[in-house]
């Protein structure tokens, strides 16, 4: 069994939605580009944005090309730890064609833009639905995945394998998005929506972006990559966040969001935790169950 699934977004819809949101902010202008309109004999990025008049900006105006010509790969990653423990993780990768990126960079350089931004969209519902689909299929067809899921079911005291699969999908989503938000200093936001990541930082490929066999890969597991984001659009809270460290002269003070989180708060959904007692033992479970499957067990002495 191949634990890898490809999927493409509707790129026109992705760009339309992003530009519609950005156009509501006075600091952003956004325009679609195409080779026919601009009479170029090379490839042009799918879009162009300017960022104007932000406080303490390093430049009066920033100009960036935008490309969203990616395909997505979903994977159930199978791992054996140094101690011999079998593990599985749901993962997502955004794949760009390197030759396509190089051609679009020519347009960016020729027009003296500040850089080319890779646009990706991350959606919680899509990730969890795809992870559940792949884990369910894996449980039926892959002995490695089946063994790990059965172990997770017993360890976490779930009643059935469907609940276990939903737990793993949510666990992996929250792990990925939590690390990204921490590295970006945006723990108070949803993490869903649009990310604009520079292909290059200080004239080099941005740390965390993988180049492999003619592919430019954004792997969400490389969360340090997101420290270099230029713009993030939170589609759940309708917020636009730009990277002041990259665009402004004064570094912003990072809000101490972690101080607002205590041991009695669910890190997945923000609801309160409660003690759940079963025949197998007890644990702290989310009061939002069964919509949220988070649970924490007391540490063994």
Swiss-Prot record:
One of its GO terms (biological process) is DNA topological change. One of its GO terms (molecular function) is DNA binding. It holds the Pfam family Zn_ribbon_Top1. Signal peptide: none annotated. Disulfide bonds: none annotated. One of its GO terms (cellular component) is chromosome. InterPro entries: Topo_IA_Znf (IPR013498). It comes from the Archaea. This is Uncharacterized protein MJ0664. It comes from Methanocaldococcus jannaschii (strain ATCC 43067 / DSM 2661 / JAL-1 / JCM 10045 / NBRC 100440) (Methanococcus jannaschii). The lineage of its organism: Archaea, Methanobacteriati, Methanobacteriota, Methanomada group, Methanococci.
